Amino acid sequence: MGDTSSLAPSAWPWLVFIAAVLAPFAMSSGGINIAILTMLFIYLSVAWNIVGGIAGQFCIGHSLFLAAGAYTSTLLSLHFGVTPWIGMFAGAAVAAVIGVLIAWLSFRYTLPPLSFALVTLALAMLGYLAISSIDLFGASRGLTLPVRGTPATYQFGADVWYYVVIALHAIGAVALSAWLYHTKVGLYLRALRDNERAAHAIGVPVLRYKMLAMAISAALTALGGTF
């Protein structure tokens, strides 16, 4: 066996990346499905971490943003023929607006962390009840897209390509999160997480950056909803 100790540290992420992308091509159907779900949850975890980890705001209503992405892109595809590759960004915009509104209503009145968490959970449940009751959203039946089997409609002939798509989503989310962490925005968000009063005292616009964190996290989550 070769000596891997001579590999530069910077080479390891690339090796892991190549292995992660190529591995499913040698897996069984069941293994690919597990890999797809694993990558999806990695992606959603990174999306949640922007508001819950970096900014320190414990939101447990991200299923609402996931639904916003899924239903927006699906409705646009069913009624207007918009490809999900475009509809997913419309869903991200809708989720970002919802996230900003939730953050504005919650943080403008300085809700404590536990109350904010419960508000987001309650709104997610209300969203579920609304979707389950409105015919436009398919009510309890849900919505069904016609099977076209073309990449342009976000449908692929082999499951492995779904893995490739969600793996690229996850890699992009990790890269975005890592970049954001080291920017001025990331510095402000960490300041809010560590000591909100001190951050406010030195001039950090608390409400604005909490809303921004919520918007970014919601938009990324919605992209996963389209998937």
Where do the model's predicted regions map?
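Transmembrane alpha-helices and adjacent helix-loop boundaries
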Residues: 1-227
